[in-house]
Amino acid sequence: MISVGCAQKPAVPNGNNNHPVSNPSSRLGSPSNNGRPPLPHQQKGPSQTSRIVEVRNTVDDRVLSPSEIFEKNSSAVFKIHTSTGHQGFQGSGFFISSNGVAVSNYHVFQGTAVGYEDIILSDGRTYKVTEVYHKSEENDFIIFKVGINRNVNYVKIADATPKIGEKIYTIGSPRGLDNTFSSGEISQIRENCKILQISAPIDHGSSGGVLLNSKGEAVGITSGGIDDSGANLNYARNIQLIKPYIP
């Protein structure tokens, strides 16, 4: 495997982004013409019967089998339905703490009116976003609180950026298919370690899902792919980008 240095000073959090949106005319993510393809219309996938695991995720430094990685983290990943009030979209997200703090892509919520979002857990229960801690259009992530009053399973964040050639796994809801599990490798690390190019497939609806290492830790937020390239070009945002902003 090729090691790539990723030393960079984290950005200073912007205090203006630490407050929740408080009125119906506000937006969880501000619309802009940034060249990203529009998200697909909201889609209904097959029913999901797995229940949320209401225990704290324990530290485990050993290499896990693919089945163990899925079993450890699947209930921490959820589907997101959003709407501008006129058009619906679908993406993914995942918990990063037991008290309901979660992360997804900024573009999943872009243009979404407050109250027009549904967080659908793997057990089928639906919740709303109660607070936005930070959002970054540039780095395409949003950290928020899901209005859930019990402990939830969550994904442990990895301490470091993975290396080129390392095995990775994804969990998300491509085309609305809840908790789809895929695997691949780190193909390249780009843009000063902000972008992880991966060979695991990322389709519409996978945006905001979790990218995992062989220990079952989050190393990225799955973000997109190049359609019809024939070269399996997919990418994720480095999870290290969110660390300065986690409450």
Question: How would you label these PLM feature ranges?
Answer:
Residues 94-95, 186, 201-222:
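Catalytic nucleophile loop of clan PA
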Residues 83-90, 97-172, 176-180, 193-197:
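Conserved active-site neighborhood of the chymotrypsin/trypsin-like protease fold
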